[in-house]
Amino acid sequence: MGLLRLLRGNKASAPVARERLQILLAHERGMRGQPDLLGVLREEILAVVSKHVTLDPTKVIVRLERGDEVSTLEVDIEVPNDLERKRVAVA
């Protein structure tokens, strides 16, 4: 009996594999419609900091590291030594 089962294969693994593939495809399809999270975060952070300090956008680095339990957002902004501040109009 064991030899026949070995030759026929395990029928239970096919539905499990199909379900996993469907989950993976659904996840991938869901990600396509979303904007690039890291790009959006970079632009929004740049806009906020630019209101107060003159900076070079090419000197801003944003990294997102995803872990199993925690994700880390690292923002590296190079600010000039003279710290040229912008004047913010008060309404």
Curated annotation (Swiss-Prot):
<keyword id="KW-0132">Cell division</keyword>
<comment type="function">
    <text>Prevents the cell division inhibition by proteins MinC and MinD at internal division sites while permitting inhibition at polar sites. This ensures cell division at the proper site by restricting the formation of a division septum at the midpoint of the long axis of the cell.</text>
</comment>
<dbReference type="Pfam" id="PF03776">
    <property type="entry name" value="MinE"/>
</dbReference>
<protein>
    <recommendedName>
        <fullName>Cell division topological specificity factor</fullName>
    </recommendedName>
</protein>
<dbReference type="InterPro" id="IPR036707">
    <property type="entry name" value="MinE_sf"/>
</dbReference>
<dbReference type="GO" id="GO:0032955">
    <property type="term" value="P:regulation of division septum assembly"/>
</dbReference>
<dbReference type="InterPro" id="IPR005527">
    <property type="entry name" value="MinE"/>
</dbReference>
<comment type="similarity">
    <text>Belongs to the MinE family.</text>
</comment>
<dbReference type="GO" id="GO:0005886">
    <property type="term" value="C:plasma membrane"/>
</dbReference>
<dbReference type="GO" id="GO:0000918">
    <property type="term" value="P:division septum site selection"/>
</dbReference>
<keyword id="KW-0131">Cell cycle</keyword>
